[in-house]
Curated annotation (Swiss-Prot):
Organism lineage: Bacteria, Pseudomonadati, Pseudomonadota, Gammaproteobacteria, Enterobacterales
Single GO biological process annotation from the record: arginine catabolic process to glutamate
Gene Ontology MF terms in the entry: hydrolase activity, acting on ester bonds; succinylglutamate desuccinylase activity; zinc ion binding
Family: Belongs to the AspA/AstE family. Succinylglutamate desuccinylase subfamily.
Function: Transforms N(2)-succinylglutamate into succinate and glutamate.
Catalytic activity: N-succinyl-L-glutamate + H2O = L-glutamate + succinate
Alphabetized HAMAP family for the sequence: Arg_catab_AstE (MF_00767)
Record text on cofactor binding: Binds 1 zinc ion per subunit.
Enzyme Commission number, as recorded: 3.5.1.96
Necessary cofactors: Zn(2+)
Disulfide bonds: none
Protein's recorded name: Succinylglutamate desuccinylase
UniProt binding sites for Zn(2+): H53, E56, H147
Length: 322
């Protein structure tokens, strides 16, 4: 299965759907779904996902190279892994999504969207994770969902972690730093993301990794992702990652800006970078007689987007943690 990406983009079913690699077994589970199981018993399970948004291609190319290294035997596998290319149709078309944003649909939220390829795919991915985690006895469960951002950022690489009732494990946060993340953002409320679903329903240590700028296939400079790629290689092979990195800055979400109607106005332009700071009292958005202002001494914006559909998030406001 050394042509997983090509098969996914073409929508082709492989002639052979299971086989042996270098020290592991593989099974093709459906378009964009590949399970890898080491020959030796392991108690660690990992979801590696990319392409939930079809225009975010660099992480997909990165996973393709990791798979090639595994198949060639140059990389040893020490985890049970489910590789997920999230939205094959959008990836093939080179667009963010075909109908609706899948990363708002998980945890059953797809039921509140008009039926589409994305709602069906979200349901399929939920079932795939349920099957994957229930078929093993993993003591450790991780989910790394790889993305690139639409706009520029004061932190080139950062992670967004779902709301979690239990403390985050230190080795997981340390690995995120070793993977080159400059900042970590901690959600305080549930959401419809893929990582929130895996964390809430399966207890996985989950993170959405934002790794740079969204570009089409073939236009990515993968050397910009070398730190993350090396950390993933070390993780898969069970090698300790470097500790010679600056710990990521930490932020928590303090509020969400939501667009409810066509009267909505967001006072940030297309050049506003992620993690831009705003002082207390700054007017961020208006909608009719409702005004959204900064309530803390300093807040930082994440994912500002004035053109989202009504009812969706137009931005997150963050507070820096000590």
């Amino acid at each position: 299965m050394d042509n997983f990406l090509a098969l996914t983009l073409s929508g082709t079913t492989p002639r052979v759907t299971q086989g042996k690699g270098a020290g592991f077994r593989w099974r093709w589970l459906g378009h964009g779904l590949l399970e890898l199981t080491p020959d030796a018993p392991v108690d660690r399970a990992l979801i590696l996902s990319a392409g939930i948004h079809g225009n975010e291609t660099a992480p997909v190319e990165m996973l393709d190279k990791l798979l090639s290294a595994l198949y060639s035997g140059s990389l040893t596998l020490t985890w049970r892994v489910l590789v997920v290319l999230g939205n094959p149709q959008a990836l093939a078309a080179g667009i963010r999504y075909c109908h609706s944003d899948m990363n708002r649909m998980f945890g059953g939220r797809w039921q509140s969207f008009a039926e589409s390829d994305e709602t069906r795919r979200a349901r399929e991915l939920e079932l795939s994770l349920e099957t994957f985690f229930s078929s093993g006895q993993a003591r450790v469960r991780w989910h790394l969902d790889l993305h690139t951002a639409i706009r520029g950022s004061h932190h080139l690489r950062f992670g967004v972690l779902p709301q979690r009732d239990r403390p985050w494990e230190a080795d997981f946060l340390a690995w995120l730093g070793a993977a080159g993340l400059e900042a970590l953002v901690f959600h305080q409320a549930p959401g419809g993301t893929f990582t929130h679903f895996s964390s809430e329903h399966f207890g996985a240590l989950s993170c959405t990794l934002e790794l740079g700028k969204a570009l089409p296939f073939g236009q990515n400079d993968l050397t910009q992702f070398s730190v993350t790629s090396q950390a993933l290689s070390a993780l898969l092979s069970g090698v300790e990652t470097s500790t010679s990195f600056s710990p990521p800055l930490r932020y928590r979400v303090v509020s969400q800006i939501t667009r409810h109607s066509d009267k909505f106005a967001l006072y940030m332009d297309a050049q506003t970078l992620n993690f831009t700071a705003f002082a207390k009292g700054t007017l961020l958005a208006e909608e009719g007689d409702k005004r959204v202002t900064v309530t803390h001494d300093v807040e930082y914006v994440l994912f500002p987007n004035s053109s989202v559909a009504c009812g969706l998030r137009a931005g997150l406001m963050l507070e820096r943690l000590p």
